[in-house]
């Protein structure tokens, strides 16, 4: 029986058709359409990683055809109009050859035209990248000319571990890339999220894969990350004030932190929290790597046109939208527009401190609208909630200024737990100021306390230690410290929400 003619499409090349030919799972003469080669050449020149991998597979098919004594031929068609897959189907229809693919749509269309189809099935073996991970591995880093390394541990507490002692070659990394790209059609929840000149981002099940190649980088590089922790909101051991605010009041939420500190993990927990409260939750991600219940719709920013997500979210009316990885002006503009439209927003940004995260909004909006857009800022460090700010607006004389006619709208950034202002945001002249007021408040409070106590006990001294005001009374003036003074100090504590302690010479604080 003569060998059949096999015409692979791009998906078959990416899946590694040569492996099936070599182990005789599939047998036949190999036909490569000229239109496919032209498309791959153009894409390779544009820097697409998938095209280069596919061209390497064509070369491999030619090599094994010589060893296996099967024909390898470049074929062409008279009619090259239409899509590549359409041209391949037309050729198979006219020449009675078999199309080889991993694409279900290609298979269905070919079968409807009575074209023989071979749908490549995935191998049952464990993926190479899965062997690089254990239960503590956060990410694996592969770079041409460097030994493979893994980051093991948890956010904020990890170490870099060498996986092998031998440096990787470009061939080693291409083999890993080939396996990743060939698995996209078979591994659940997998897709190529972004493909640009020199870079490709793939979501492969739980793994997020970033592939970089020359000329964008100085060599082939693959970074594979995987979430090591999935937590419920209740597992963060948050203060009840924060939990109550998230449940009842917060609608303009900003989650900030350094890369790898657990921001997305917290955002994921928050999205599930609102879903359990029967809220309609949607996400905007790039890439889509959050693992959420099916009730949550996840949108990709990369596949949407400008304005498309804005229209979709306004018309679908979610209660909350999680915006993961806000980076550029377009991201912040969409967050602001949706929040002002009344949609609850949860934004995730990179920042080294919570005030830095707020600063990224300052030049994009009017100061008077800040609390309407941002009401709660959560700073994540080492996988835990490290700081929470609430934002409110008032009209007052900014702390540190004295003249009454300097009163103006001031946004107070308060520690949510202690309810004490730590920063004030206001316009001074033409510049928007972000002023730390904690020390300023301490100094002014201390001055008022000194004035009051020195009118009664002239030689008493006041210091601020460990969050308390310490009044030290000299031995010869102890008699002036009476019930009247104690009453005044208690009223002062209550009025200014501070703690005062009195110290006598050679005695412990009282």
From Swiss-Prot:
Keywords: ATP-binding, DNA damage, DNA recombination, DNA repair, DNA-binding, Hydrolase, Nucleotide-binding
EC number: 3.6.4.12
Transmembrane regions: none
SUPFAM superfamilies: P-loop containing nucleoside triphosphate hydrolases (SSF52540)
Matches recorded under SMART domains: AAA
Pfam families for the chain: T2SSE
Free-text disruption phenotype from the record: A single deletion is mildly cold-sensitive (growth at 55 Celsius versus 65 or 75 degrees). No change in sensitivity to mitomycin C. Double hjc-pina and hje-pina mutants grow more slowly at 55 degrees Celsius and do not grow to the same cell density as wild-type.
SUBUNIT field: Homohexamer. Interacts with Holliday junction resolvase Hjc, interacts with helicase Hjm (Hel308).
The protein, known as: Holliday junction branch migration ATPase PINA
Lineage of producing organism: Archaea, Thermoproteota, Thermoprotei, Sulfolobales, Sulfolobaceae
């Amino acid at each position: 029986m003569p060998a059949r003619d096999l015409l692979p499409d791009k998906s078959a090349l990416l899946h590694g058709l040569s492996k099936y030919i070599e182990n005789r799972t599939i047998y036949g003469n190999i036909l490569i359409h000229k239109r496919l080669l032209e498309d791959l050449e153009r894409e390779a020149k544009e820097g697409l990683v998938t095209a280069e991998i596919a061209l390497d597979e064509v070369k491999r098919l030619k090599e094994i055809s010589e060893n296996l004594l099967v024909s390898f031929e470049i074929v062409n068609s008279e009619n090259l109009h239409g899509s590549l897959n359409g041209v391949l189907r037309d050729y198979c229809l006219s020449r009675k050859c078999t199309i080889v693919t991993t694409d279900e749509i290609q298979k269905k269309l070919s079968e409807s035209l009575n074209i023989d189809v071979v749908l490549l099935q995935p191998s049952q073996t464990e993926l190479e990248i899965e062997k690089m991970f254990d239960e503590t591995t956060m990410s694996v880093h592969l770079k041409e000319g460097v030994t493979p390394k893994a980051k093991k541990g948890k956010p904020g507490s990890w170490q870099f571990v060498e996986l092998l002692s031998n440096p990787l070659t470009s061939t080693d990394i291409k083999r890993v890339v080939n396996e990743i790209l060939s698995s996209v059609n078979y591994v659940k929840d997998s897709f190529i999220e972004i493909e640009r000149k020199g870079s490709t981002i793939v979501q492969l099940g739980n793994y997020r894969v970033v592939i970089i190649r020359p000329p964008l980088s100085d060599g082939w590089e693959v970074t594979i990350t995987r979430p090591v922790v999935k937590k419920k909101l209740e597992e963060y051991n948050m203060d009840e004030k924060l939990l109550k605010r998230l449940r009842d009041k917060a609608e303009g939420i900003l989650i900030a932190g350094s890369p790898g500190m657990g921001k997305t993990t917290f955002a994921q927990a928050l999205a599930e929290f609102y879903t359990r409260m029967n809220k309609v939750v949607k996400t905007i991600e790039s890439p889509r790597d959050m693992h959420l219940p099916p009730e949550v719709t996840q949108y990709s920013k990369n596949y949407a046109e400008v304005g498309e997500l804005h229209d979709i979210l306004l018309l679908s009316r979610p209660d909350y939208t999680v915006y993961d990885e806000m980076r550029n002006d377009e991201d912040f503009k969409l967050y602001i527009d949706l929040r002002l439209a009344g949609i609850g927003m949860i934004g995730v940004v990179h920042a080294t401190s919570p005030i830095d995260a707020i600063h990224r909004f300052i030049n994009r909006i009017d100061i008077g609208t800040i609390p309407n857009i941002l009401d709660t800022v959560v700073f994540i460090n080492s996988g835990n909630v490290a700081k929470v700010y609430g934002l409110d607006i008032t009209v007052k004389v900014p702390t540190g200024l004295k003249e009454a006619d300097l009163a103006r709208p001031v946004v107070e950034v308060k520690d949510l737990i202690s309810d004490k202002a730590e920063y004030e945001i206001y316009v001074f002249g033409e510049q928007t100021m972000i002023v730390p007021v904690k020390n300023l408040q301490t100094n002014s409070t201390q001055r008022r306390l000194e004035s009051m106590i020195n009118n009664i006990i002239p030689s008493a001294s006041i210091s601020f230690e460990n969050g308390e005001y310490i009044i030290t009374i000299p031995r010869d003036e102890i008699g002036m410290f009476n019930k009247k003074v104690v009453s005044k100090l208690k009223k002062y504590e209550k009025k200014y929400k501070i703690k005062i302690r009195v110290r006598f010479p050679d005695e412990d604080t009282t």
